Design a protein with these regions (language model features):
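Short, intrinsically disordered, charge-balanced linker/junction segments flanking boundaries
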Residues: 118-122
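N-terminal, active-site-proximal structural segment of metallo-dependent hydrolase catalytic domains
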Residues: 1-50, 63-66
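Structured beta-strand-rich core segments of catalytic domains in phosphoester-bond hydrolases
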Residues: 34-117
Length: 122
């Protein structure tokens, strides 16, 4: 299983680069961080023509946000929240590995700082 991850810093301004990465490297799964777009504005067909039919988008307007694009069907997938915040920083998905056993995938965006200098609060 080939997995790529990319802190993209705004998916909508890098659509051509995403398509080039998917075409040239052909990962089974692509994890994106800092997509900086609300779920409903995520590029609807991104990667579809290359077989990336399974997706979990956990975005928010202007900052943060993570996405998982996959050729492999999800057994289960859901957004997660941390530290009592509604920031879109974590997406979790499970896919079947080549041996048929589930593989858990956690896509995190972890900013360098936070509102207060406390790891438990951020």
């Amino acid at each position: 299983m080939r997995i790529c991850t990319w802190n993209i810093n705004s998916v909508r301004i890098r659509l051509d680069q995403v398509m080039r990465l998917l075409s040239e490297h052909q990962p089974d799964i692509l994890c994106l961080q800092e997509i900086k777009v609300a779920n409903e504005l995520f590029p609807e067909n991104l990667g579809e023509e290359l077989g990336y039919h399974h997706r979990l988008i956990h975005g928010q307007k202007a900052y943060h946000g993570v996405a998982i694009l996959s050729r492999l069907p999800f057994v289960k997938a859901e957004p997660r929240y941390w530290c009592g915040k509604e920031d879109s920083r974590h997406a979790w998905a499970s896919v079947k590995g080549s041996d048929g056993k589930p593989v858990e995938l956690h896509n995190f965006y972890v900013p360098a700082g936070g509102d207060v200098p406390d790891p438990e609060a951020n």
